[in-house]
């Protein structure tokens, strides 16, 4: 069904599969999804029931449903989060991973009011700090050891292990002050106990990006990997670049996490030119970054494409790669009997001015344009975010355009 109420079979026609494996070519195909949301047939000119809903892909690409590994969607529970509907299916994203908006003290609310009602699949990294991002940066969640309750974190995970995929630590002096790298060490210990990955936000030192990488292990995630902040850019320090390159090769996941302050065109282009690609592309979408400069996942993907990240790698970075972090199987995703979970999109010629987190401007001449998110038997019409007129607003760091 197309954003409807009652489930009907869904016939998707004239789409080109990508990122489903070598057995699928560039030729177009049709996909029939049953009322129960599982794929019932794949091929050309399929016989479909009389009551079928039809979506004509018009030659668009179809991939596994896009995964955004870093968003903030505890709307109403934090002062920074947006609604899942603002960055999910209506933007072509079928899986959203909240990056530490909730801590152990309020995760139950996030589960009840955000995860359970949402049509998108929602997973979460649990914030190491008990309060999460209730009053983001105004009331930092990791000021000292009193902000961390190990026993309650373990209890929270035990009660919500189907939703929590890891531990999140923000390692930046804006949050931790002079506490440095200690929260990262504590977070890593807890992640080891729980046998889950840790995602670490790197930013204004301390802690140093170098120190963080030395603590992480295979499967862990460093988000904001291509930030342009002084003292935290991999392109201003050859030793740091070499360390990041080595850690990436050893299985530490470099995640974009664009956000309002954490992505640089110059850093990304230089790193990719030297062969260091991000493992995953994510937005760090929240109320202070959506309207400017991030917009959505499709635009963020387009930014990486513009700095010469290959098309196939861009798609992998929003499907298979982030899915592996949250233990979401992508095996045989386009097979009869599998639940339908797709993004239908075009890659179009464009001439769009886009800005990174440092204020540097680039023109995007190729754009990912989401058309539909397919979740079970429902095809939700999708599009990129169209920014509103910006205004100068005051916030925890001073003033900025939003």
From Swiss-Prot:
Binds 2 zinc ions per subunit. After heterologous expression, a stoichiometry of 1 zinc ion per subunit is observed. Zn(2+) 1 binds at residues 70, 72, 168, 284. Gene3D superfamilies: Metal-dependent hydrolases, Urease, subunit C, domain 1. Zn(2+) 2 binds at residues 168, 201, 224. CDD domains: Met_dep_hydrolase_B. InterPro entries: Amidohydro-rel, Deacetylase_Atu3266-like, Metal-dep_hydrolase_composite, Metal_Hydrolase. The keyword Zinc applies. It comes from the Bacteria. Its cofactor is Zn(2+). GO terms for molecular function: carboxylic ester hydrolase activity; deacetylase activity; hydrolase activity, acting on carbon-nitrogen (but not peptide) bonds; metal ion binding. It holds the Pfam family Amidohydro_1. The record marks 170 as: Transition state stabilizer. Its EC number is 3.1.1.-. NCBIfam families: PRK09237.1. Esterase that catalyzes the deacetylation of acetyl-(R)-mandelate (in vitro). Can also hydrolyze acetyl glycolate, but with lower efficiency. Has very low N-acetyl-D-amino acid deacetylase activity with N-acetyl-D-serine and N-acetyl-D-threonine (in vitro). Theoretical substrate docking studies suggest that other N-acetylated amino acids may optimally occupy the active site and may in fact be the physiological substrates. This is Deacetylase Oant_2987.
